[in-house]
Amino acid sequence: MKTKTREWIVFIILLIAIALVSFFAISVGTSNGFEINVSEEDTTATPAETTANADHEPVSVERQVYDILVEAGISHAGACGILANAQAESEFCSDNMENYYNKKFGVTDAEYTQLSDLEQVDFVNDSVGYGLWQFTYYEFKQALWDTAKTKGTSVSDVKTQVETLIEILKTPEFSKLFRFLKETNSPENAAKEFMLVFERPANQSESAISTRAVFATEFYKIFN
């Protein structure tokens, strides 16, 4: 009898111990807010991504650029040729710094942009290709810098860059190209002329021209 009684007592004590451990585990888990925090992170992350997508999809950089160009009198085909060059030069990243200099200076696109806006680098004269069309010549970068300062924007601002481009195209050096872009009905020719006359990239092969022509044709279909 004494042995059985002891076994029952031990058994009951074990049950009580298990119950107490479970109770305290639940209490601690609830009181430290861990489960609530995880839930909050999950629910806040999704709406943020959705909002970002909703904000950018209706008015893409491509659409912003196209609309400003057309408003300036450039034809549908001409605008698509310019878009094709932006695609080839920067993939429509308006803060794009020429990749070679990212590695050389050890800075990101965003860091270079911030340093430029704060006048902590010689943005105008450093020969670093920048922006949608990779402005490199000091005349182009000076024009972009002046426009940004006048408008109170960053040099990475899309509208500022497009308006700067238009003003450059109006100068005597590019007046023939500007007139051509206003009159042309060929997106492929627009892409080619803009590339050879304005961009003047190191690679001017038929393959490079063809790539930009294909981009122009695609934009022509999208915005038609």
Per-region residue spans from a language model:
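Non-catalytic cell-wall polysaccharide-engagement segments
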Residues: 2, 6-37, 141-224
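Cell wall/extracellular polymer interaction/catalysis modules
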Residues: 74
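N-terminal export signals and maturation junctions of secreted/periplasmic proteins
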Residues: 10-71
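Short, functionally critical alpha-helical segments immediately adjacent to catalytic or ligand/cofactor-binding
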Residues: 77-93, 100, 195
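Generic signature of intrinsically disordered, low-complexity, basic-rich segments
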Residues: 40-46, 80-82, 144
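Peptidoglycan-targeting cell-wall enzymes and recognition modules
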Residues: 46-64, 90-182
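Intrinsic disorder/low-complexity signal
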Residues: 6, 39-41, 48, 88, ...
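Short, well-structured alpha-helical segments
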Residues: 63-66, 79-84, 188-192, 213
